[in-house]
Amino acid sequence: MASRSAGSLITHNNVTYIPPALMPGYRGHVPTASFTYGDTYGNTSARCFQDFRSTVLNSSRSPYCQGGQFPTSHSNDPALVIGHRSRGWDRFLHSPSWSRYNVDFKRSDELKQFHRAAEQHRDHYRDKSGTAHQVPHFIIPVKNPQTFPLPQQVL
């Protein structure tokens, strides 16, 4: 067997073999896609899903036949492309124009106060300096012996 110092290492691996740990990007398993070194798993799976989606949409007779119309960045139909959709005031033309008259104002005020308390509670947990006070609504009550144990219970 040749030694490494002689410069000729005999191995069963090919010269072009790249170990999986040294390959760039995550390479998962897509059963229908052939394994190549040049493309990542994300690009391969996106291309696979986009090809499947295009064939389904092109073969369907109605736009709602195989699951409806899905917005995407690549499509054969220009109406489905996300960049083609309206971004101005036209997007509100097809929104429902109804209002609720049975609003419970007391309940909505209670929900607003709870939302404010939840935000203060989040600020308390995010605070590293200890200057934000704890919100009393979210303090879980404990029994007195857990807080102040008797001397004979400590042992």
From Swiss-Prot:
Entry keywords, A to Z: Cell projection, Cytoplasm, Cytoskeleton
Family: Belongs to the CIMIP2 family.
Pfam family, one: CMI2B-like
Function of the molecule: Microtubule inner protein (MIP) part of the dynein-decorated doublet microtubules (DMTs) in cilia axoneme, which is required for motile cilia beating.
PANTHER family (alphabetical): PROTEIN FAM166C, UPF0573 PROTEIN C2ORF70
Location(s), subcellular: Cytoplasm, Cytoskeleton, Cilium axoneme
Record GO cellular component, one term: axonemal microtubule
Protein's name according to its UniProt entry: Ciliary microtubule inner protein 2C
Disulfide linkage: none
InterPro entries: CIMIP2C, CMI2A-C-like_dom
